[in-house]
């Protein structure tokens, strides 16, 4: 049994490895799929639909052989906010639009650009999402009643505090049993899917010893149907697309970033190399397909991808198997899921939040007490207090500002008044400066002030040593042109030594090279004669 193309060299032995890995990760995905759906504000079956449809598509069309896709914790606060504001139908439309965007991102080769998001921003918003997921489950863990959900963190926390008196002892016992099983199984039986084990045991305990004493999936959302929903293309109108564009863009950007991070984790574990652009296309196809069958937005799941690799996966077939396993469980066991207490789901999500919180990274970066610490803290705080969009946008803006500041400080301008060339000329109207570092909009202020000051003192000839300037933008080019004009008004001249390829190309394109004059450019200062 051999296949060509992507599965070249594939055989029965490899399929057996993929089958085992796919079954294990499929079992892991079942409780997580339901839990993430509930946390996002939709019925649990939508999470399972997503695992099946999006999970299979991501494996078949993505750029990583080991990627496992589906609903993830990172999406929870985003999807919950969209549900609160626009409703489920519009969430599905936003997910479809995000899929189209992701395909376009991949086709326009934007995969590598997504890797440029600074680490403090990633750690900050990931930790912020973890806090939101964890705190959102406090009500289910304690079995609180009549807790209304709000878009803002502080409103939700105030609501929980107000309803603390409605706690349910049976729900707390059920949640604690699930939490203990999760923690113990991770230490004692690391290869056993702890989430499924905790879900099953805590549910059985609740059904046998505390029947009808707490909220369940059935009492809250109704019975899960034993089939996929019918194919239904979303009703797209221009007004809806304009309204949902910001939400779709956030889903696309977060989904793309999360999927590439997950693929990079897989690369580190297997020594492989994923195709970022193909991964974005695969994620896009998955997010276009999932809403057609009731699925919510999906992305690469780091923990499930790692589980896939640890259990011997060798190809995308394992991801397909994982989707098929979830589908079979959905078709056979769906009615039994109505008995699962919400208190059994809460510790699963709390542990997911704890594991994704980047605690060590946060502590290490905050200890640095530098720009990265400030960016992380700002991104984290704004993600929690407002939303992911504000948090990430502010984090990126701060990172940009600090980067410009660092780069501008890296530019140095040195007066070369003792240079041998000046000593030979013995002309007091000639000055020479050596410039080091990039010349761009962030460094032009010091460039202009330094050079113009000396142009006024020695207006005849200015020699610039630029062999250590490897980048120049149009802002710096404009300053250079201004300096040249000042010198020419005094019948002087500007000479440039050691101009590198990128600045030279820029000066040619803008015409400044011709205005300065070819005869005033030198490869080495020894060539200066006039």
From Swiss-Prot:
InterPro entries: SLC26A/SulP_dom (IPR011547), SLC26A/SulP_fam (IPR001902), STAS_dom (IPR002645), STAS_dom_sf (IPR036513). It is a multi-pass membrane protein. Keywords: Cell membrane, Membrane, Transmembrane, Transmembrane helix, Transport. The chain crosses the membrane at residues 19-39, 41-61, 68-88, 91-111, 121-141, 164-184, 192-212, 241-261, 313-333, 384-404. Residues 420-530 form the STAS domain. The keyword Transport applies. It is found in: Cell membrane. One of its GO terms (cellular component) is plasma membrane. One of its GO terms (biological process) is transmembrane transport. Its main location: membrane. Belongs to the SLC26A/SulP transporter (TC 2.A.53) family. NCBIfam families: sulP (TIGR00815). PANTHER family: SULFATE TRANSPORTER. This is Putative sulfate transporter YvdB. The lineage of its organism: Bacteria, Bacillati, Bacillota, Bacilli, Bacillales.
């Amino acid at each position: 049994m051999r296949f060509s193309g992507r599965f070249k060299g594939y055989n029965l032995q490899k399929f057996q490895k993929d089958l085992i890995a796919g079954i294990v990760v499929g079992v892991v995905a079942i409780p997580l799929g339901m839990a993430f759906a509930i946390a996002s504000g939709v019925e649990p079956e939508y999470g399972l639909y997503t695992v099946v449809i999006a999970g299979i598509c991501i494996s078949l069309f993505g750029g990583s052989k080991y990627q496992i896709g589906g609903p993830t914790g990172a999406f929870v606060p985003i999807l919950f906010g969209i549900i609160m504001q626009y409703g489920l139908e519009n969430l599905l439309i936003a997910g479809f639009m995000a899929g189209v965007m992701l395909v376009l991102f991949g086709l326009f080769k934007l995969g590598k650009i997504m890797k440029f998001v600074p680490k403090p921003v990633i750690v900050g918003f990931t930790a912020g999402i973890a806090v939101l997921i964890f705190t959102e489950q406090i009500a289910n863990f304690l079995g609180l009643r009549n807790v209304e959900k709000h878009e803002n963190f502080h409103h939700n926390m105030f609501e929980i505090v107000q309803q603390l008196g409605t706690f349910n002892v049976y729900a707390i016992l059920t949640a604690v049993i699930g939490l203990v099983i999760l923690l113990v199984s991770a230490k004692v039986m690391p290869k056993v899917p702890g989430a499924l084990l905790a879900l099953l045991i805590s549910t059985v305990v609740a059904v046998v010893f505390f029947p009808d004493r707490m909220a369940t999936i059935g009492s809250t959302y109704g019975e899960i149907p034993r089939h996929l929903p019918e194919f239904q293309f979303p009703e797209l109108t221009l007004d809806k697309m304009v309204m949902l564009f910001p939400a779709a863009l956030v889903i696309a950007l977060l989904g793309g970033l999360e999927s590439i991070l997950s693929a990079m984790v897989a690369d580190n574990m297997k020594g492989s190399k994923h195709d970022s652009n193909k991964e974005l296309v695969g994620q896009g196809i998955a997010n276009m397909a999932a809403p057609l069958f009731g699925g919510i937005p999906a992305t690469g799941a780091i923990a499930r991808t790692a589980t896939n690799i640890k259990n011997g996966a060798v190809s995308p077939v394992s991801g397909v198997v994982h989707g098929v396993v979830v589908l079979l469980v959905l078709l056979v066991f769906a009615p039994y899921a109505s008995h699962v207490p919400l208190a059994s789901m809460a510790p699963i999500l709390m542990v997911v939040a704890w594991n994704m919180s980047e605690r060590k990274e946060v502590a290490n970066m905050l200890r640095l007490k530098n720009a990265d610490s400030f960016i992380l803290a700002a991104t984290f705080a704004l993600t929690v207090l407002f939303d992911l969009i504000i948090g990430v946008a502010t984090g990126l803006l701060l990172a940009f500002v600090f980067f410009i500041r660092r780069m501008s400080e890296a530019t140095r301008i040195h007066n070369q008044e003792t240079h041998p060339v000046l000593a030979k000329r013995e002309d007091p109207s000639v000055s020479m400066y050596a410039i080091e570092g990039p010349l761009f909009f962030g460094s032009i202020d010091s460039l202009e002030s330094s050079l113009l000051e000396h142009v006024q003192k020695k207006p005849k000839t200015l020699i610039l040593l630029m062999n250590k300037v490897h980048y120049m933008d149009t802002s710096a080019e404009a300053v250079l042109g201004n300096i040249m004009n000042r010198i020419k008004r005094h019948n002087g001249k500007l000479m440039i030594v050691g101009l590198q390829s990128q600045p030279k190309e820029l000066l040619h394109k803008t015409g400044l090279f011709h205005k300065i004059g070819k005869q005033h450019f030198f490869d080495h200062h020894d060539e200066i004669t006039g």
